[in-house]
Structures are given as C-alpha cells and as structure tokens.
Amino acid sequence: MRWWRVAAILSIGVGLGLGWNAFSGRGFALDKNAFLRPGEALVEISAAETKTRLEKGALVLDARGLDFYKLAHIPGSYSLPEEDFERAFAALEPRLRGTADIVVYCAGYGCEASHNVVRKLAQKGVYAVILNEGWPAWQDAGFAEKEGDLP
C-alpha cells in the first residue's frame, strides 16, 4: 500500500472520530473548560463544602437521569439531567437566574454529566461548580439522602 493511501485512510478516520466527538453530545471533552468565561476553569468542591453551601442557600443540581434522581438524591437538590437539559433548564431557569451559588453533581467516578451540564449552563450565562466525585462522595460522607421526584 502506498504511503498516501495510508495517510488518506488515517486522515479520514481522524476526521470522522473528531466529528463524532464534536456532534454526538457524549464525546470526550477535548477542552474541559470550553464555554466558560475567559480566565475561568471548571471548579470542583468536596461533599463537605457542598453541604456547607447548601445550608447557606446554594442551589444543588443533579445531572443524573431522572430515574436515578427519584431513587435517591441530595435533599433540596433539583433534577437537571444532562440528556434532557433544555427542557429541565427551561423549567428551572427563573430559579437558576436568581441564585449566585450553584453546585452540580452526577454519578461520580468518571461521570462527565456534571461537567457537561456546567458547560451548558455557562453557555446560557449561569455559572456553577461541581461536586467532586459526585453522588458517591456525598454518600461516602454519610450525609442525608432523599427519595422521590421532589427536592
């Protein structure tokens, strides 16, 4: 096989991979700080810091799917699933725009949903931090949990 054919096949493969990554909505984050204000980066906080902020009036958002939210979630948190972001954002927008301190969490340990939701929020002018290691960190800390579809 000639070198140019190898280069062409490789180029097509890379192009298709990058295209899939860019448009699938579930691709790998090539730049985890995309769509944030200049000079800002994704900020992660601990479960203890999340609890402190929640007690001071922070809004906590669960980026997991609604079924997981109903099984158990942080008391007072609202469901904002990554896969249903636009609909859920529209319902929560007035509350989000009126809150300065927002924390987002997901299933933790490699889950990118909270990162993706924070980026989508930033695109809409709403800025949030991430609960590092998400729901498992909250559970491991022994903090309260709530079942059902209400905060």
Q: What does each model-identified segment do?
A:
Residues 59, 127, 144:
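Residue-level detector of anion-binding/catalytic polar loops
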Residues 1-71, 151:
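Flexible, polar/low-complexity N-terminal or interdomain linker segments that lie immediately upstream
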Residues 93-139:
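Catalytic cysteine-centered active loop of the rhodanese-like fold, especially the PTP/DSP P-loop
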Residues 142-151:
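Active-site neighborhoods of enzymes that stabilize oxyanions during catalysis
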Residues 38-104, 108-110:
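Positively charged, proline/Ser/Thr-rich regional signature most characteristic
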Residues 72, 140-141:
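Short Asp/Glu-rich motifs
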